């Protein structure tokens, strides 16, 4: 996820300050950045930054992403963390603890196909 446009648009120090401010104000929430994978055929998401309840599952968050991009029911969507498909039943808090970036955000990429081939 090195090509994150969010990372390119905002310097590391500003991202660190923002994520720690968010975590202090909302300790039961996870700061997540969601971006579409390059060369993906699914629509772009209308907003990249999410404050996700810590007890939400990955599957529930994928449902939120589907609704935001208005993806039809017959189309598949895959959400990746560090180029890996996280377990659908995993809690977002566990995914955050294991995969958060040095700036304090969890970066997720979505695609209409299993672009990385890792399950």
Swiss-Prot record:
InterPro entries: Atg8-like, Ubiquitin-like_domsf. The C-terminal 2 residues are removed by ATG4 to expose Gly-117 at the C-terminus. This Gly-117 forms then a thioester bond with the 'Cys-558' of ATG7 (E1-like activating enzyme) before being transferred to the 'Cys-258' of ATG3 (the specific E2 conjugating enzyme), in order to be finally amidated with phosphatidylethanolamine. This lipid modification anchors ATG8 to autophagosomes. Pfam families: ATG8. It is a lipid-anchor. The keyword Calcium does not apply. Residues 118-119 form a propeptide. One of its GO terms (cellular component) is cytoplasmic vesicle. Keywords: Autophagy, Cytoplasm, Cytoplasmic vesicle, Cytoskeleton, Lipoprotein, Membrane, Microtubule, Protein transport, Transport, Ubl conjugation pathway, Vacuole. It is found in: Cytoplasmic vesicle, Autophagosome membrane; Vacuole membrane; Cytoplasm, Cytoskeleton. GO terms for biological process: autophagy; protein transport. Ubiquitin-like modifier involved in autophagosomes formation. May mediate the delivery of the autophagosomes to the vacuole via the microtubule cytoskeleton. This is Autophagy-related protein 8c. It comes from Arabidopsis thaliana (Mouse-ear cress). The gene is ATG8C.
């Amino acid at each position: 996820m090195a090509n994150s446009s969010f990372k390119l648009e905002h310097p590391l120090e500003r991202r660190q300050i923002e994520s720690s401010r968010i975590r202090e104000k909302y300790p039961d929430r996870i700061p997540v950045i969601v971006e579409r994978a390059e060369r993906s055929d699914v629509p772009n998401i209308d907003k990249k930054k999410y404050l996700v309840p810590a007890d939400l599952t990955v599957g529930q968050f994928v449902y939120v992403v589907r609704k935001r991009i208005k993806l039809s029911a017959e189309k598949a969507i895959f959400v990746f963390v560090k180029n890996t498909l996280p377990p659908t039943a995993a809690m977002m808090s566990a995914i955050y603890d294991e995969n958060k970036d040095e700036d304090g955000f969890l970066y997720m990429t979505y695609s209409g196909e299993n672009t990385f081939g890792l399950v």
